[in-house]
Amino acid sequence: SMDRAPAAITTPTEFDRVYCVGDSRTVYTQVALGASAPSNVEFIAKVGEGLDWFKSSGYKTLYRSVAKRPRIEKKAVIINLGVNDLKNSASYVKYMKKVAANLKKYNCKMYYLSVNPVNSAMIKSVNGKARTEAQVAAFNKAIYRGLCSGRKRSFTYINTCTNLQMKGWI
């Protein structure tokens, strides 16, 4: 069955450096990879956070790390934020456009990873922070429309949400 970790973790080769920026989903991806995380992948993430954290801390860390690498290096930045502040999509679009413009000067290709599906019934049953399927869909749509579509798009969209909904988890 497919409910096992892959036999090998592949090191990204299209880019010299990959930055994974996000919340708990990114933190626990790093934890799951442990020592097998590729050496050219850097994680900048904090559990339970969103745009405020990124503006006050996460972006500074990302920018410093990107800026100290040679400009000739090809870099990928994957943003995986939003699940903790789903009602803030307009602010994300506005701020992330500036982030993309700044980082593209350092040879960064920008990616936005969709917020993955939630199970609102399960969240409610464990008294978790209320999030609904409709909120996730609205956030993802706003990010896609505002950042990832059209001629002047700032990001390439990675639609894991629909992929998981269509194909399942495991």
Language model regions located:
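Sec-exported extracytoplasmic/periplasmic mature domains
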Residues: G34, R71, G82, K97, ...
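Charged helix-capping and loop-helix junction motifs
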Residues: S91-V99, E133-F139
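Extracytoplasmic/secreted cell-surface and envelope-processing proteins
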Residues: Y28-T29, L86-V93, N119-V126, Q165-I170
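Substrate-gating cap/lid alpha-helix
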Residues: S120-T160
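Conserved SGNH/GDSL esterase-like catalytic core that processes O-acyl groups on lipids
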Residues: P12-Y95
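Active-site segments of SGNH/GDSL-like serine hydrolases
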Residues: V83-N84, N102-V136, L164
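N-terminal low-complexity, Pro/Thr/Ser-rich intrinsically disordered segments
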Residues: S1-R17
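Hydrophobic/aromatic residues located in beta-strands of well-ordered beta-sheets
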Residues: V18, V77, M110-Y112, Y157
